[in-house]
Amino acid sequence: MDAMGSAAEEGTQKKKRRPLVPPPPRPPRALFCLGLQNPFRKFCINIVEWKPFEMIILLTIFANCVALAIFLPMPEDDTNSTNSVLEKVEYIFLFIFTIESFLKIVAYGFILHTDAYLRNGWNILDFTIVSVGVFSVLLEQISKLQGLPAPGKSSGFNVKALRAFRVLRPLRLVSGVPSLQVVLNSIIKAMIPLLHIALLVLFMIIIYAIVGLELFSGKMHKTCYFKDTDITATVDNEKPAPCSSTGQGRQCSINGSECRGWWPGPNNGITHFDNFGFAMLTVYQCITMEGWTEVLYWVNDAIGNEWPWIYFVSLILLGSFFVLNLVLGVLSGEFTKEREKAKSRGAFQMLREQQAMDEDLRGYLDWITHAEVMDPDMEPRDGFSQLEEGGSETDSLYEIEGINKFIAFFRQWRLWHRLLRRKSRDLVKSRFFYWLVIIIILLNTVIIATEHHHQPDSLTKAQDIANEVLLALFTMEMIVKIYALGFQSYFMSLFNRFDSFVVCTGLLEVMLVASDIMSPLGISVLRCIRLLRIFKITRYWTSLNNLVASLLNSVRSIASLLLLLFLFMIIFALLGMQMFGGKFDFEDLEVRRSTFDTFPQALITVFQILTGEDWTAVMYNGIMAYGGPTYSGMSVCIYFIILFVCGNYILLNVFLAIAVDNLAEAENLTSAQKAKAEERKRKKLARANPDKTEEEKLLLAKKEQKAKGEGIPTTARLKIDEFESNVNEIKDPYPSADFPGDDEEEEPEIPISPRPRPLAELQLKEKAVPMPEASSFFIFSPTNKIRVLCHRIINATTFTNFILLFILLSSISLAAEDPIQPESFRNKVLSKLDIVFTVIFTTEIVLKMTAYGAFLHKGSFCRNSFNILDLSVVGVSLISMGIESSAISVVKILRVLRVLRPLRAINRAKGLKHVVQCLFVAIKTIGNIVLVTTLLQFMFSCIGVQLFKGKFYSCTDTTKITADECRGYFFVAKDGNPAHMEAVPRVWSHSDFHFDNVLSGMMSLFTISTFEGWPQLLYRAIDSHAEDMGPIYNYRIEIAVFFIVYIILIAFFMMNIFVGFVIVTFQEQGEQEYKDCELDKNQRQCVQYALKARPLRRYIPKNPHQYKIWYVVTSSYFEYLMFFLITLNTISLGMQHYGQTAEFSYMSDILNVAFTGIFTVEMFLKLAAFKAKGYFGDPWNVFDFLIVIGSVIDVILSEIDTPGIPATPGAEESSRISITFFRLFRVLRLVKLLSRGEGVRTLLWTFIKSFQALPYVALLIVMLFFIYAVIGMQVFGKIALVDGTHINRNSNFQTFPQAVLLLFRCATGEAWQEILLACSYGKLCDPMSDFQPGEEYTCGTSFAYFYFISFYMLCAFLIINLFVAVIMDNFDYLTRDWSILGPHHLDEFKRIWAEYDPEAKGRIKHLDVVTLLRRIQPPLGFGKFCPHRVACKRLVSMNMPLNSDGTVTFNATLFSLVRTALKIKTEGNFEQSNEELRMIIKKIWKRTSMKLLDQVIPPIGDDEVTVGKFYAIFLIQEHFRKFKKRQEEYYGYRPKKNANNVEIQAGLRTIEEEEGEGELQRAISGDLTPEEELERAMVEAAIEEGIYRRTGGLFGQEDSFHTGPVSPLHTITSQRPLRFSEAGSEDLDSPVFLPEPVFFPPPRRNRNTNNSTISRGLDQRLTTPDFERVQQSEEQWDTNSSISQATN
């Protein structure tokens, strides 16, 4: 019993020992007076740590949010009863929160202890909110006591501003939800790299703002007015725009109008470049890609459209596509890291719990085993009870016979039941049943899709019947499944639960409709949810299944993100209500829908700003509400900018980050599954017939041969699944032309890669493709001279270049055509040229067909898909030449198809070909995602049809609701001015985007998913009322949920997954080529850098005067001075503004001259210091030089340009442009600042590197734009330019440049759907074009839908994501662990090496290596705190080859640094891994010269002396000294110096010396002075770093300095192991004393002047007794620490 008791006790003790959550540590004293035992403090602690208390507080916060949301803001501080009640309730909340703060402060202390109340971020937030609340209440009371009016505008404004703080309370919910904290943490962690990017963006904005200020200042203040009035002259639907009275800008075309100044400017004078602040806001607005085209068009109107586009397009490319995508790169990196952490934390937690359980189990087992020992005592009682039971059984024997019959029947029934269940289970699991269900679902889908507006009654009846039949079938399916699988296992599956939910709601719906309780509409939406069943298909489609699994996975992580997003929206909506509630009512009578007047409306507005659609319009309203473009008004834009940055850039990019993260996991999942399946198959085959394994190996090869579709590498053609599993299967990704069609064109090995390496690396020596054996055209045999000649011509590089040139020329001629007048002179010339081009291309194809044959045999011309493309393009040209009359529409189509000519270049430029092939692979892989997205789109479209069909009609007069009422005329205020009324006819119109049938619904939804124009559609839907009826204002605001759910699901989530997929695919494709080379991406980049880098030349002048200048120019003070001056210059530029006084202008001119003078002086100083060659060697200096020249010209021009000189208007205009052009040079000085900051410099370096990765991607984009622009010109070129529509003077397809600009606008998503509508059929034709009478409205075509949607999808999803993929690849270093070496660290090595090797000879003394590496910070160098001994050990492991003159080379040193830091082939047999590494380098970088390779990795058998061996001997020597010293201390005597004995010296002997008699003679190698110099250099390095005292010189002990004569240095001869002469070897066991050599050469003069001065001083110091004392004490101090090492 004792044992048992003790075991139980042990168990309970263990339980006690392990509390689940440790309580937060409490300080011993709070508020200086309350100890832990104080009863009041105990009470506070108990309350604060009581669970329900936390719940109560969270509920209070929630209630507070609700109260804030109910509050109705009103204009002019009006109020109503609800609001006054809420004011009172606010006091209660404040009271609760104050008490909570007080209790916590008492419990945990206020601020002084480590875990005090204010040491926690959330508590600081709480405390601020509470104290501000209390403060505002006090202020109110004081103002009441003083008898002031109720807190209104004047006194109460500060109170209201303080009130806005309450809005932050919902943030406290975050501290309650752990999953929120992962998302928040990753965002907070990302803040540091994000700040770098923010700086870069800010810098861009400043530069562009100042450029804008210089170029466009004051240009936006003229517009067209009617003569002698203040009324602006505009066309219908057009905002007033700037104009110019002279030059290239817009002229006033309306009769009776003139161009006059004093117009405030666009957007009520908010959008312009008149001063620095407004310019920055305008530039920022352009970077967000919202409304940038409007700004561009206004500038065009003001100054002409020749060059402003350069400014805006470059801004969008750099700002939006590049820099803002960096944000994405950073966030996804951080998110991945954060999730990894959370994962490992979870794993650790699980482990701990597992251990705890094991411990418990052990306790119980002990308990039980102890108990079993006592068990025998109990046995008798058991036997006795059994006897009793036996007795009772005999009594009931008679009753059993009656029951037996029943049991037999029951058993029979159970048998049948079991059989039936088994049969039905087999049925349910069979493929037949599965496909049956799928067919029923598809039928269901078709029936739902047929529904549309104005459908015939018969169709409606048919749909109802079909619905009921299908419902019955689905109910049967459910019942059968439940019967077959049983309740429990049926409801285990998520799909089944969903199914039963849908069926039950369907039944409910039928009952409700039949009993007329509710209208059929409400629940018919649920019918659409049945469509989700389509996802059942995924059961047998593995890759799709994994995709859906990964989507559901990301839904989990995205749920917490959505919660965060929602919190964020609530806070900003409440804040918006406090600031703008009831203020958006202006005099112009226009109804604004995006307001902050009620809470739901505010939420929608905030959501709209998050998606970035028309957020600028809301911001302009906000600014106008606070008094327009004044100081107070403009401060409002801070709210919108913060909302936009945090919401759009940060939170929405986290969506993408999560998507990319989870997709990568799904890919791994798929490939892992594939690998397992293959393994299983292989084992099966092996078991079935062992002899077949050989054939099995050939299976893959055959599979690859079978793959059809020429020209695309086999990898691209393997099925999607196999492509995904490629990672785990070993296949040869680029079989040498082993499949039909390509073997006539044997390609050099260029791997598929979205980021092709520079062509230099890909040896593009084209091999001539052999002729096929068969005869061509049945005439020419392979030996036929004509055919051989054709073959030779085709394969000549000059011929290929010639054809490329003509492809280029023909493309230019296509772009030069005039789309409006087909019969113009220009077009006639071009058509003659066209004939020439067609003849040349036809000749080329005939030659090729002659050489290779047409298509009958393997390897002939038409067996290659790219050749077929060539042939079809040329064929189209030939046919269109044959049919001349342009009236036939076929010819028009054929003429359009000539546009595909540039595609022929793909077959000629290999790099481009591979980008295209990579795109194909990506498109194939994306198939699954497209499928899922289309299904969801379709489902939402069906729901949309149910909700909105026929409800988007409206009358121009909003008071009329039906089509019958909408007749006649009504009055409208012109330009929102009630004084000018005009009569307008009423028109009954239909919205352009609507949900009348499923297709138009999908179109509308597609535009919503691109975030363009969705608020208009949303408010249309909110106002929708009934079929064929007009809108009623805010009729059902809850409909917004449909749009918001759709946007979150499709636009945020699916589209981002789509983007993520493209990125992941490209990255995988990029890695594909390297998958066998054992180096990861980072290692490859670093090795490549180490192989390609060359040392920098550092010029140090010999001339003493020049040296002085050089010394000044290179000093850091000079740098800082220039930095300061550039900043001053920036400020002076930024202070200029429109309408400045003459004195101010004069001052700024003087300053400009002064700065130009200063920078010119700087240039001359640098030229003097570096001489021309040295100066122009640095790109930054070249940049400086250009800027100085430009600035000087600018100064001269502005001096010449005096206002007194009369000139013709045109001349004035052109001189203006030249002057403003030179003004740019002032601004470009700013860019010099970029060369200073370390982080920004790294960013820039990577930036330029990613540009290098883009050339082919860029080429592809150019081709895409070219083709679409030419098609656009041919198809939409004739549409008339009408101001007020979307095809107008600024955006049209009439010239090639205009068409490209318009397409660029569409690619950025600026109202592309409006342009689509403006190009669709039935538009007015241009008066100059060739339409027939009565055909004025026949321009435009329905082809516009296909054209714009395909262009948008290609651009937005594929092409721009190529940018993102490249950026994410190159910028991963921003979020990577900085302790991992990356290529961005290696620049520092080049810079510091230059100080030791100013002539850039590529060699330095090996002694300098230690000091060099200690000056470079880790991870590349050792850092200045690295002890010398550790540094030497690292050098031993680096082991660079040492030249005979004692120097090491640049590349070898850098390479070995990279190699040791990244652990590339450092394990195992050294020589073997060296060989392997040589092979890898040869494989990846084929052009590496053997000389360089031997330098960085010496080949086997190369008896080279290396730095490693050299330093190893030194370490041995040092350990030996220590060993000797310990012996002395142990035996208590100091051995006498024996004349024959000398300490061991580092170095290698020649064979002759080893075999010589007793006396060894030693020579000195190359350039090195005796060992003294080595020791001295080491001591010098230590003194330089101020570490001498701590580490005791280089190796701790400096015995050699003060024992005996100076020791000699070794020669470097062979690589034999160290052997010593036998003399004196008996003295000690392990280390051996050597005879002291007689001969010793005098030390040479040190050539390095720097060293020699120091060494002189050192020599003196080393002889002082002082030094020896320090030395001895250090030796003692050091001995203990190294005992362990010595014993090793």
UniProtKB/Swiss-Prot annotation:
Signal peptide: none annotated. Residues 1336-1379 are annotated as: Phenylalkylamine binding. II repeats lie at residues 417-663. Residues 1-51, 109-120, 178-196, 333-431, 486-493, 542-560, 661-797, 853-864, 910-928, 1064-1116, 1171-1178, 1238-1256, 1369-1688 are cytoplasmic. InterPro entries: GPHH_dom, Ion_trans_dom, VDCC_a1su_IQ, VDCC_alpha-1_subunit, VDCC_L_a1ssu, VDCC_L_a1su, VDCCAlpha1, Volt_channel_dom_sf. Phosphorylation by PKA stimulates the calcium channel function. Residues 986-1075, 1324-1390 are annotated as: Dihydropyridine binding. Coiled coil: none annotated. Ca(2+) binds at E290, E613, E1012. Residues 71-88, 140-158, 217-307, 451-465, 513-522, 581-635, 817-832, 884-890, 949-1038, 1136-1150, 1198-1218, 1277-1343 are extracellular. Disulfide bonds: none annotated. It is a multi-pass membrane protein. GO terms for biological process: calcium ion import across plasma membrane; muscle contraction. IV repeats lie at residues 1103-1371. It is found in: Membrane. I repeats lie at residues 38-335. Residues 1678-1688 have a biased composition (Polar residues). III repeats lie at residues 784-1066. Residues 1-24, 672-696, 729-755, 1635-1664, 1669-1688 are annotated as: Disordered. One of its GO terms (cellular component) is voltage-gated calcium channel complex. Residues 740-749 have a biased composition (Acidic residues). Each of the four internal repeats contains five hydrophobic transmembrane segments (S1, S2, S3, S5, S6) and one positively charged transmembrane segment (S4). S4 segments probably represent the voltage-sensor and are characterized by a series of positively charged amino acids at every third position. Voltage-sensitive calcium channels (VSCC) mediate the entry of calcium ions into excitable cells and are also involved in a variety of calcium-dependent processes, including muscle contraction, gene expression, cell motility, cell division and cell death. The isoform alpha-1S gives rise to L-type calcium currents. Long-lasting (L-type) calcium channels belong to the 'high-voltage activated' (HVA) group. They are blocked by dihydropyridines (DHP), phenylalkylamines, and by benzothiazepines. This is Voltage-dependent L-type calcium channel subunit alpha-1S.
